[in-house]
Amino acid sequence: MMTFPAGPMRLACLLLAWIVAGNVAAAAPAACKGTIYLTFDTGSQSQATLIADTLRRHHAKATFFLANEKTVNGDFSLDPSWAPYWKALVAEGHAFGTHTFDHVYAQRDLPDGKIEMKPQFGAQAGKKVAWTGQQVCDELNRVATRFHALTGATLDPLWRAPGGKLTPQLRAAGAACGYAHVGWAPAGFSGDELPSQTWSNAKLLQQSLAGLKDGDIVMAHLGIWSRKDPWAPAVLDPLLSGLEQKGFCFATLRDHPDYRQHIAEQRR
């Protein structure tokens, strides 16, 4: 038990103790009123650095879904030139899933059990191909292999279909090789790929702040070729600040109740 001397010195000590205790209490973080799960898909990569810097400034963790996409630099997002970027995000504690290596869009399930797919990049870009479940797994695992080669880290057993286009057979194929599919909440659609002429950044920000709730998964991109007024420079920082003011915290999908057990089981 702490004791204080008598007289004026005692009063001074008590005052000092009160000030210190008050400062400690003020410095203690407020309890989270809910958690938002930020996710980013690869894209043109035009906003990749800005997004990483903004997350770092807010001490916010996110989950990134990776495909080998053409970037504004003329390279591809899983080329060795992007290794420092991905390594830095790994070191900061973010999570990572596969978005198919060639950014492959699902078309439809076929009667023979195969899935009709259409790669955006790679040797079969623009062509419709019929894949078996194993070929789907191979495509998902290409990202895991490249990610490990670039960073030395292991990809999380999560994936997201490009465009969110998912068929029953495609979902089953991903699950068969250990990947859980991740979509996003209705309010979590950032709108960063919508035309800025009709969907202004101010409108998208207001919509997100009004609609997001505890447990929601947010989906945005590291850059969109078609949007004239980029989303991230105008929206991301005020979005995170606004959510923080509402008492929300941010976490990766490793902590999401729908995925944490799956991830733990796949890690065993």
PLM features per residue range, with description:
Residues 12-23:
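Bacterial N-terminal signal peptides
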Residues 28-31, 62, 228-268:
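C-terminal domain-boundary segment and adjacent tail
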Residues 27-131, 139-157, 231:
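Active-site beta->alpha N-cap acidic-glycine motif
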Residues 1-13:
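Bacterial N-terminal signal peptides that target proteins for export
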Residues 40-43, 65-69, 99-103, 161-164, ...:
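Active-site-proximal beta-strand/loop segments in catalytic clefts of secreted hydrolases
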Residues 108-115, 193-198, 228-234, 262-266:
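Histidine/acidic-residue-rich catalytic or RNA/ligand-binding cores of hydrolases
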Residues 165-211, 248-259:
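His/Asp/Glu-enriched short active-site or ligand-binding loop at hydrolase and phosphoryl-transfer sites
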